[in-house]
């Protein structure tokens, strides 16, 4: 299976993660997903009155140095890990 196809499959699986998944892990997945699909951060950092959006932006910025392919691989690995932990 091609990396992009596997990534898309795991993006669907990520939506089945339990609500108990930590915010930290959700933010890691968000950052890797954005890096995989958009690439480097292309917006300014949200202000302090938007803490949720700011945390998401920070998670994306944290993985900015990864290639799209590397981010896809890391995303797949993280989703697999979280699914195993929740089983």
Swiss-Prot record:
An acyl-CoA binds at residues 30-34, 56, 75. Gene3D superfamilies: 1.20.80.10. InterPro entries: Acyl-CoA-binding_prot_CS (IPR022408), Acyl-CoA-binding_protein (IPR000582), Acyl-CoA-binding_sf (IPR035984), FERM/acyl-CoA-bd_prot_sf (IPR014352). Disulfide bonds: none annotated. The keyword Transport applies. Keywords: Lipid-binding, Transport. GO terms for molecular function: fatty-acyl-CoA binding. GO terms for biological process: fatty acid metabolic process. The keyword Transport applies. It comes from the Eukaryota. It holds the Pfam family ACBP. Residues 3-87 form the ACB domain. Belongs to the ACBP family. Binds medium- and long-chain acyl-CoA esters with very high affinity and may function as an intracellular carrier of acyl-CoA esters. This is Acyl-CoA-binding protein. The gene is ACABP.
């Amino acid at each position: 299976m091609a990396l992009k196809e596997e990534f898309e499959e795991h993006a669907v699986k990520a939506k089945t993660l339990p609500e108990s998944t930590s915010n930290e892990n959700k933010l890691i997945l968000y950052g890797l997903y954005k890096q995989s699909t958009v690439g480097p951060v292309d917006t300014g950092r949200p202000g302090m009155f938007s803490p949720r959006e700011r945390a998401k932006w920070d998670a994306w910025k944290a993985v900015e140095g990864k290639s799209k392919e590397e981010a896809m691989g890391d995303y797949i690995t993280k989703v697999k890990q979280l699914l195993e932990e929740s089983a």
